[in-house]
């Protein structure tokens, strides 16, 4: 029984660590993969899958803080309080959901098999790699031809993929685009991306998933807080 409980504990920790590490390179791909894996999850594991997704979102904010600091101290000084607050909120919501986990009885608990060689993970990574290239090109030409209006629109559209190329292209054009516009578009892209991540999580987890109420509640709180902070920024 002790070995079985220890095995379950390792499974739960593995999901959380996957979310934290995955958020350092792509929260969108990480959330999609976690949602796919969760289709075989028990009711007891549901909270940890969603907690791992929110930890990935939390790490995304920290990742962008580092990238922005590297490319533009001016933008960093105006945006870091918002990103830091949202990272803490996402982590806090994730930890709260993790703490709601129902511990299974030793007699009926079985650790989930870890299928780290799942080819679906490679397919998801490949799809997002292609989208990364597409949005890199789109962002470049939007900056050249479409102006501020095009940037605002693209900041929301870019959320359907990894928003890293969009934000990196913005940061590399600080000489031709106002700092306020870059900061606003970066925050809008992040909000859009979190909303899309929530829909990806719901879609890949499948209909009737045990994760659904936790996904809606957890991501809903994070998105609502993001919108409030964005309003404060515009005020």
Segment roles from a protein language model:
Residues 199-222:
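Interfacial loop-to-transmembrane junctions
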Residues 78-90:
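Alpha-helical transmembrane segments
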Residues 96-106:
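Membrane-interface capping segments at transmembrane-helix boundaries
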Residues 5, 104-177:
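Transmembrane helical segments that form the transport core of multi-pass membrane transport proteins
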Residues 24-26, 32-42, 52-61, 69-74, ...:
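Membrane-interfacial helix-loop connectors
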Residues 227-235:
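Juxtamembrane boundary at the C-terminal end of a transmembrane helix
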Residues 19-29, 57-61, 113-133, 157-165, ...:
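Small-residue-rich segments of transmembrane alpha-helices in multi-pass membrane proteins
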Residues 1-12:
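Single conserved hydrophobic/aromatic residue that forms the stacking wall/gate
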């Amino acid at each position: 029984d002790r070995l079985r409980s220890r095995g379950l504990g390792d499974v739960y920790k593995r999901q959380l660590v996957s979310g934290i590490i995955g958020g350092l390179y792509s929260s969108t791909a990480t959330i999609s993969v976690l949602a796919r894996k969760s289709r075989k999850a028990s009711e007891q594991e549901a909270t940890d899958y969603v907690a791992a997704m929110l930890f990935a979102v939390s790490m995304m904010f920290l990742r962008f803080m580092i990238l922005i600091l590297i490319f533009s101290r001016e933008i960093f000084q105006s945006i870091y309080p918002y990103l830091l607050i949202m990272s803490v909120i996402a982590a806090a919501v994730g930890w709260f959901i993790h703490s709601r986990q129902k511990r299974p009885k030793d007699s009926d608990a079985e650790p989930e098999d870890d299928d780290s060689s799942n080819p679906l993970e490679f397919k998801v990574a490949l799809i997002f790699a292609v989208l990364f290239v597409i949005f890199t090109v789109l962002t470049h030409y939007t900056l050249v031809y479409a102006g501020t209006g095009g940037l605002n629109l693209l900041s929301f559209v870019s959320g359907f993929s990894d928003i890293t190329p969009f934000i990196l292209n913005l940061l590399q054009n600080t000489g031709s685009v106002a700092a306020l516009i870059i900061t606003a578009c970066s925050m809008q892209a992040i909000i859009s991306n979190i909303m899309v991540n929530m829909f990806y999580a719901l879609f890949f987890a499948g209909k009737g998933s045990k994760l659904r109420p936790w996904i809606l509640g957890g991501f809903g709180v994070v998105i609502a807080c993001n919108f409030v902070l964005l309003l404060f920024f515009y005020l």
